[in-house]
Amino acid sequence: MPTSTYRHEWDCGLVSPTATAIKAMAIIKARPNDIFPFKVSGGSSAIVMGVNYDLLNTIGPNNLGLGPDPIKVTSVSADSFTFSTLAGHHRGAGQTITFKTFEKGGHVWLTQFGTFNSLDPRQYAYNTGATLAWALQAHNLRVAIGTVGSANLATAERALDALRPSTYLNVF
């Protein structure tokens, strides 16, 4: 299956004693239902290596009747984790998305890096929805780490750029 990728980076505000990349990732992993723009349900209330989860309402109410999107956490580190999609997920099995936080230029950043089947035309529509979901995830993280007011205008401009799929898609 030909695989393509997308990547989004969001400025989540100024680094401070309470807002660091490691602390931001710890919050995402400990409180996924406060940070993700959809419900994370399953084996644990926190993100844990090897645990399966169902993502609910990822593409609309009741996932537009398609059922939950099952995933498994396949990698975890202090500053990142990766989901792999399982059979029954709207993107199909075997896709990945990695969430990573880092510090650059005195700011905390959130990156979402995902793969998808480039031969399935629905995936491009899903990417548009994902862009909006990941923008909301970044906002929720800013709220959680207390940096909502410190993210600059470039963040909004980056969100608009992210809606232009050719900017962030890498087909190979």
Positions of the model-derived regions?
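Short, cysteine-centered beta-strand-loop-beta hairpins and adjacent loop/turn segments enriched
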Residues: 60-65, 88-93, 118-124
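Intrinsic-disorder/low-complexity, polar/charged segments enriched in Ser/Thr/Lys/Arg/Asp/Glu/Gln
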Residues: 3-9, 80, 96, 107-109
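Hydrophobic-ligand binding "helix-grip"
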Residues: 65-104
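Catalytic Cys-His active-site segments of thiol-dependent hydrolases/isopeptidases
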Residues: 84-87, 110-114
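Hydrophobic ligand-binding cavity/cleft-lining segments
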Residues: 1-64
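Solvent-exposed residues in well-ordered beta-strands and their adjoining turns
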Residues: 13-16, 102-104, 115-117
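A conserved amphipathic terminal alpha-helix motif
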Residues: 109, 115-171
